[in-house]
């Protein structure tokens, strides 16, 4: 099996499909599809159409009902007649091997689900050997129960011509591109090798963490694309890659930061996202160890996002799942410069909702109860950054006195790094 060769994605057109269910209303489904569209664009695809259907639960055979599947098929056929080829259909939930096989048989195009799309972006973003190894293992975990479908799919894609070089397309990056006769034993052997490699990396990183000295560890956590890397750059005065795309950060970056006379370690971690299976998150153990071993979590939230409260829940649940819950935390509401609200007309007598609240009114809701553990900033416009430094400094100092009460360097003179 060859190592990853990260490929440049050609522009492919994509159709999105989501469900409106008892547990997921239309507003939430549209919000999820907005995120799925952003994921598709990050992977290099152009979204041209969306389909939704109301069902109690997903159809176990074809995800959507037969009538909706036929509607999607007719749309693809019409586009082909107009010489506008649809490259793929992306579903907003993880599909079973049976569902993928049945849907492909009907639509005759590439079928992706949310998980495979996210893994494809991981493959694009991975830069270090550690990240590439983690991504490869995660992709094999996803691939293993879908092997039979993968063979058929890759043969349709053109087998020998779809190698892992420059021609890789959305959903086909990483392993599985060149060996169509891959079987379960080969994959399991490869996974064992990758796990051994990651175990060795874990040991190396654990040793590195032990050698960092007696300093408080602070980890930036949050949903993907909320501005963690920009905040990292402001606090550490270093250049960590920051981009307005999902999963711009995949490798954990650790920097020594000094505020006033107090040095501490600050790490920027991979962003979390909804509907990502825990067993795939587990592939990123060495990366997430920075979160597990942190003394303080700085939870960054994009307050301009309409679903920011649900994103907070996703992050908190993921933290609990990986063993990072229950730690001291500061909640940072970023992007206040981008916050918008819907102003009601004077004669509108309907009850006000969250969408009608100004930022000042929103700040007086449940967030007000958090007092010093909550801060509102704009990292891009550098609004309230001094206040952010003050809050982080106070919390780090409190933790340092508790953890290292006899550490002399608290009384030494340090200067903030230029």
Task: Give a label for each model feature.
Residues 2-5, 31-34, 57-74, 251, ...:
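Switch II of P-loop NTPase G domains
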Residues 1-16, 37, 148-226, 232, ...:
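C-terminal-of-GTPase-core extension/linker across diverse P-loop GTPases
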């Amino acid at each position: 099996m060859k190592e990853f060769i990260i490929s440049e994605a050609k522009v492919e057109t994509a159709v999105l499909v989501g469900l409106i269910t008892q547990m997921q209303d239309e507003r939430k489904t549209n919000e999820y599809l907005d995120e799925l569209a952003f994921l598709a664009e990050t992977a290099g695809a152009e979204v041209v159409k969306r389909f939704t259907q109301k069902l109690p639960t997903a159809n176990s055979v074809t995800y959507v009902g037969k009538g909706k599947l036929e509607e999607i098929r007719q749309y693809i056929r019409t586009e082909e007649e107009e010489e506008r080829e649809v490259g793929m259909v992306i579903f907003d939930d993880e599909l079973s091997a049976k569902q993928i096989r049945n849907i492909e048989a009907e639509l005759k195009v590439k079928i992706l689900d949310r998980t495979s799309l996210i893994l494809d972006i991981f493959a694009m973003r991975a830069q270090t050997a550690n990240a590439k190894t983690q991504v490869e293992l995660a992709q094999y975990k996803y691939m293993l129960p879908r092997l039979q479908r993968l063979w058929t799919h890759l043969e349709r894609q053109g087998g020998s011509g779809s190698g892992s070089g420059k021609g890789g397309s959305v959903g086909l990056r990483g392993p599985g591109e060149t060996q169509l006769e891959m079987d379960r034993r080969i994959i399991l052997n490869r996974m064992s090798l990758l796990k051994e490699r990651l175990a060795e990396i874990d040991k190396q990183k654990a040793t590195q963490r032990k050698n960092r000295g007696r300093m408080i560890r602070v980890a930036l956590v949050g949903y993907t694309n909320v501005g963690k890397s920009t905040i990292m750059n402001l606090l550490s005065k270093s250049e960590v890659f920051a981009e307005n795309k999902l999963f711009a950060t995949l490798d954990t970056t650790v920097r020594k930061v000094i505020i006033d006379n107090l040095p501490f370690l600050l790490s920027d971690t991979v962003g979390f996202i909804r509907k990502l299976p825990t067993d795939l998150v587990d592939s990123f153990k060495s990366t997430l160890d920075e979160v597990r071993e942190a003394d303080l979590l700085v939870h960054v939230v994009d307050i301009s996002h309409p679903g920011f409260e649900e994103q907070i829940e996703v992050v908190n649940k993921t933290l609990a799942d990986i063993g990072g819950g229950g730690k001291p935390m500061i909640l940072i509401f970023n992007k206040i410069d981008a916050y918008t609200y819907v102003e009601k007309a004077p004669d509108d007598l309907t009850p006000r909702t969250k969408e009608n609240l100004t930022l000042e009114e929103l700040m007086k809701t449940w967030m007000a109860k958090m007092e010093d553990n909550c801060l509102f900033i704009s990292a891009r416009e550098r609004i309230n950054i001094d206040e952010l430094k003050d809050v982080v400094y106070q919390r780090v100092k409190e933790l340092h006195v508790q953890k290292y009460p006899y550490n002399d360097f608290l009384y030494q003179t340090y200067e903030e790094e230029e």
